[in-house]
A protein has these predicted regions:
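A conserved FAD-binding loop/helix module that cradles the flavin
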Residues: 231-233, 237-240, 245, 445-471
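N-terminal glycine-rich dinucleotide-binding loop that anchors FAD/FMN and/or NAD(P) in oxidoreductases
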Residues: 89-119
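Residue-level recognition of phosphate/Mg2+-coordinating polar/acidic sites
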Residues: 83, 104-107, 124, 130-148, ...
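Predominantly flavin-linked oxidoreductase catalytic cores and closely associated redox partners
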Residues: 166-357, 362
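Glycine-rich FAD pyrophosphate-binding loop
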Residues: 67-93
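N-terminal Rossmann-like FAD-binding beta1-loop-alpha1 element of flavoenzymes
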Residues: 48-77, 469-470
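Residue-level detector of alpha-helix initiation sites
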Residues: 52, 56-58, 83, 232-233, ...
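Short beta-strand to alpha-helix junction loop
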Residues: 119-127, 147-166, 233-237, 381-388
Length: 471
């Protein structure tokens, strides 16, 4: 091989022992087979077979980075559905919010309720700027919105999908759809035997490199390295083949959802957007902020979705039956709110409550709040009195609603839970329980709020796995 010829030339060159050692480790890092007579002959097979289980964002990034670092490796992405990157296709309303500028994030815990310490560590190697640059260098111009969310300039998720699929095709990464992993067995030769359930529909992606396989049935294949990038599972059973190997599983539960509100009159305000607001759960330290959207079932918008993420386990433990507090005026200092209300009373004593909206609240919401307090819209501001002012301030800053269950957030279904990070080598993301098995993406106990943070975690963890899976 050309690398053997290079090594022969190296032997004739005048280089120090230290330089030779560095060159050895460099080529070992690239998984290049060394000369057969080298005293530290690389013990990897010349054709390293790698399986990536899950054709999502993390899986593709792991495969592409692995192929870049270990070009000799035979890499196949296995996807259980009939097409890859389905979740990428719908995220951001079909526009693909692929990352975030993180300019408004001072502490990663704000974005990653679970896994923030690991993400901080991994961001030193591949962060949002690296992801931004990677896509632009691979032909996808990006734009950053005012809310710091990053989208393809085309505003079409297929720009991202086409980039990933075409890059995989160009590098020779194979893609097999309709392959569902059902079991993993450790073999004596340190390979991993994978059992797949193959559906009747032929499972290769059109235009991508693919090996032949049975049209349906059970298929067994052994690999030297395996990366699990299957995303989150709504039920514990989805992790059975991993728990059977000895991995600890943090209970999977939903972590990004809307709230069903019991108050029928409140839901009549559907379509009303209030921004920004504070949301919180009384009696806890759980809180969030951002725009709030009133829907026909209750509450949505970033202020609710963020709260649902941070409070995922608390909400699950309470069967999604809790009180939510809304601070409609986005002001935590009650004294300042009192000053504002007193200023309105002094300046407009004879005007009706309905005619002056504190903090420029939406008209429909303000009328609803007046009636919720038990006042007539025609009541004059001068007639509020101290008791009335206190009630108004409390309503503006701590308005309570009963949550009766959770709704769905169709643009981004996320779960918390998954493979316990205590089972993972935090540098390589290789399993401590099963050698040669790696993890990336939401299958790990890492999840984020809405805004491109979950996809960034997929790019980052996929990149790290791709750096090490061929070593």
């Amino acid at each position: 091989m050309i690398y053997y010829d290079f090594y022969a030339k190296l032997q004739k060159s005048i280089v120090s022992a230290k330089e030779k050692e560095e060159l050895f480790f460099f080529y070992q890092r690239k998984a290049v087979p060394l000369h057969p007579n080298h005293p530290k002959k690389y013990d990897m097979p010349q054709s390293l077979h790698i399986a990536i289980i899950g054709g999502g964002a993390a899986g593709f990034f792991a495969a592409l980075e692995a192929k870049r670092n270990f070009p000799h490796a035979d890499i196949t992405i296995f996807e259980k559905n009939s097409k890859v990157l389905a979740k990428v296709e719908i995220t951001g309303g079909g526009r693909c919010n692929l990352t975030n500028s993180f300019e408004e994030i001072s502490d990663l815990k704000q974005a990653y309720p679970r896994g923030h310490k690991l993400m901080k560590r991994l961001f030193k190697r591949f962060d949002y700027q690296h992801a931004f640059d990677w896509f632009e260098e691979n032909g996808v111009p990006l734009v950053t919105q005012e809310d710091q969310c990053v989208f393809p300039q085309s505003q079409d998720s297929h720009s991202i999908i086409d980039c990933l699929v075409n890059t995989a095709k160009r590098l020779g990464v194979k893609i097999q759809c309709n392959h569902q992993l059902t079991a993993i067995t450790e073999l004596e030769d340190e390979r991993l035997l994978l059992d797949f359930k193959v559906s009747k529909e032929k499972g290769n992606l059109s235009g991508a490199s693919s090996a032949s396989h049975p049209v349906s049935g059970i298929r067994q294949i052994a690999f030297h390295r395996v990366a699990i990038t299957t995303g989150g599972h709504p039920k514990q059973e989805g992790f059975k083949h991993l728990s059977d190997l000895g991995h600890a599983i943090e209970q999977p539960i939903p972590s990004l959802f809307t709230f069903n509100i019991a108050d029928k009159a409140f839901k009549n305000l559907m379509g009303t957007v209030v921004e920004p607001v504070y949301t919180s759960i009384p009696g806890t330290k759980l809180k969030a902020e951002g725009p709030l959207l009133i829907t026909h079932w209750g509450m949505s918008g970033p202020a609710v979705l963020k709260l649902s993420s941070h409070a995922a386990r608390y909400l699950h433990e309470n069967n999604y039956q809790i009180k939510i507090s809304v601070n409609w005026v986005h002001e935590s200092n009650r004294s300042l709110v009192e000053e504002n209300i007193q200023g309105i009373i002094i300046a407009n004593p004879q005007k009706q409550l309905a005619s002056i909206r504190p903090y420029n609240l939406p008209s429909r919401l303000w009328l609803f709040l007046i009636q919720k307090m038990g006042y007539a819209p025609e009541k004059k501001w001068s007639e509020m009195g101290k008791k009335g002012c206190n009630l108004l301030i409390e309503t503006l800053t701590n308005d309570l609603y009963q949550v009766n269950g959770k709704g769905a957030f169709k643009e981004e279904f996320v779960t918390c839970g998954g493979i316990s990070l205590s089972n993972i080598d935090l540098h390589t993301l290789e399993s401590k329980v099963c050698p040669h098995l790696f993890f990336a993406g939401e299958v790990l106990d890492i999840d984020a709020i809405t805004g491109g943070f979950n996809l960034q975690a997929a790019w980052t963890t996929g990149y790290v796995v791709g750096q090490h899976i061929g070593e």
